[in-house]
Amino acid sequence: MTNKYIDIASCRIFSSCWKRSKIVFTFILLLVVSACSTTKHLPEGEVLYTGNKTNFVDQSNTPVGQTAVGEIKAALDKSPSTKILGFIPFPFGMWVYNDFVKYEKGFGKWIFNRFAAKPVFISTVNPDIRVKVATNLLHDYGYFNGKVAQQTIVNPKDSLKARIEYTVDMRNPYFIDTVYYSRFTPKTLRIMERGRWRSLLSHGEQFNVSDLDEERNRISTLLRNLGYFYFRPDYMTYQADTTLVPGGHVSLKLLPVPGLPPAAQRQYYVGKTSVYLIGKNGEQPNDSMNYKGMDIHYYKKLQVRPNMLYRWMNYQAFVKNDSLRNLQRSRLYSQYRQQRIQEKLAQLSIFRYMDLQYTPQDTTATCDTLNVRLQATFDKPLDAELEVNVTTKSNDQTGPGASFSVTRKNVFGGGESWNVKLNGSYEWQTGGGKNS
């Protein structure tokens, strides 16, 4: 009797699956039969894009060349709408688009939204623009003589369909011969020359715009760590000359941009430091004190020790590194110092918000001093955390567990934390044993 019921249920399941398969098969068959053309709904004057092919001539095998090839392929590639998921060569999405574009609601609209692929036209692919982008990429990677061309090939069986064929002639790459620094102030030039040993550009390396940008960032960081607060990487530009040294070599000259602001060419020193401590509920400071020349503004009662605030804001004076201590004594602005102060304050976890600003001491044209202002909002003093888990031990004991922890921040006014954690669990024996 039991086997009979099982057989009947199996037949019903098979029948249901067969009916669903027939519906799907019929739906696909109707699409195939009705979709006699993928171009019947094209707007006037448009040509359906069916794909592209990229041919490389003299393809470079250098590491830089391989990177260039990858980016050029990505710039030229565009998937047509005549493929499912971009790789199956059947215009399923176009068939759905042609047959269900007329539906505005109901099942037909659902099918359209789910499966239809909007046609891609040759005009929207913009092959000429893609050629320009690919050509610029060749130049960026040192292929100054490289050429990119495109040809639109119309389908001989249907004039409303066409594909695009690109030809990329990379030719020979150019390599760096020399790099000069010029037209900066004498002091700036001396700093740049002293740091040249860390340069990312060297003789014999292939020209690469990415390396040029990284070199500008390196020099900007070098200068900003030695007082040039207003200096930026985009204040420098390159001139490239391929005629000085023949045979595929380029001479580079790094120059300041025209109209470089005078402030960017001046070293700045750190002046007065002010700290504004805001309460955890947004209470504004209503009292202040001065500690070793540092003004501290706070609400009602100072919640951190002033000597610790001074140490955090002048950490370089307390390190063992002689060069860092000398830089601290010189009071030159340093981007590295600014970042380290922000990191150290963030690691304390006692402030919810921090803002460290450097502003000129006055508005005169000869001002070379920056005042420091730290504004920090205290976080809530207590942190609570509850964890729930299930543990299994090697002795077949299994059960739920929980842990509850409380952390008190800034216990002694120096960024210290005090933590209490409670653990609890209930276990029973598994694997055929009795509960315990």
Regions found by a protein language model. Name each.
Residues T26, N172-Y174, R266-Y268, T377-D379, ...:
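A generic structural signal for short, non-catalytic loop/turn and secondary-structure boundary residues
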Residues V32-A35:
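C-terminal motif of bacterial Sec signal peptides marking the signal peptidase cleavage site
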Residues S37-Q347, Y353-L356, T369:
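Interaction-mediating elements
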Residues M1-K19:
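N-terminal secretory signal peptides that target proteins for export/translocation
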Residues T188-I191, R331-S436:
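Gram-negative/organellar outer-membrane beta-barrel architecture
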Residues M1-N3, Y298, S436:
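Short intrinsically disordered, low-complexity coil segments enriched in acidic
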Residues S16, R20-I28:
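Sec-dependent N-terminal signal peptides
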